[in-house]
A protein has these predicted regions:
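N-terminal beta-alpha lobe that positions the nucleotide/phosphoryl donor
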Residues: 1-181
């Protein structure tokens, strides 16, 4: 079975590609027995499943082949980012992912809906030459599984804000290779 969700206690700094910088650091702090609220990470494996959606891939392929991001065509980049965001926001989270998120959220509150923070953890976030501070979204005081699932979807979509796409473009990063954990 694929690891769509991992508890903080299972995370460490060697897992950047799977959980991103923020979650990897939360895992390190948890394992050092420092006071960290209990939590879990929705891994990049889950994002990748969403991102392999045929329509989403079609959008990315059209823009990649048009070389919009090599040419610095701001309008084409903006159009691409908006199309990807809308597709992610309209997507239904596959049952196999929603079920494990639901289970992990249920464990946090012992079956009761509790407020949680839903935060993005990008795989490119902690590159030594780039500060991605504030590029992806965070949602605080989220209560109930439907709200949690919606916040996860909105975090995934925030990978494709105009600002985030332009920033990656300015660093020469491959737009299609960026992944997001939550």
């Amino acid at each position: 079975s694929r690891d769509f969700v991992l508890p903080f206690s299972a995370l460490h700094r060697d897992m950047l590609a799977l959980v991103g910088g923020k979650a990897a650091n939360l895992g390190e702090l948890t394992n050092a027995m420092l006071p960290v609220p209990p939590g879990f990470c929705v891994t990049t494996t889950a994002y990748t499943l969403i991102a392999t959606d045929a329509e989403l891939q079609s959008i990315l392929n059209i823009y990649a082949t048009s070389q919009a991001w090599e040419g610095g065509d701001v309008q084409r980049l903006t159009d691409m980012a908006q199309a990807v965001r809308h597709r992610i926001l309209a997507a239904t989270i596959p049952t196999e992912i929603a079920d494990v998120i639901t289970g992990a959220y249920g464990v946090l509150g012992s079956g009761e809906p509790i407020p949680v923070a839903v935060r993005s953890s990008a795989t490119a976030e902690d590159l030594p030459f780039a500060s991605f501070a504030g590029q992806q979204d965070t949602f605080l005081n989220i209560v109930g599984i439907e709200a949690v699932l919606d916040a996860v979807r909105r975090c995934w979509a925030s990978l494709w804000t105009d600002r985030a796409v332009s920033y990656r473009e300015s660093l020469g990063l491959d737009q299609s290779s960026i992944k997001l954990a939550v």
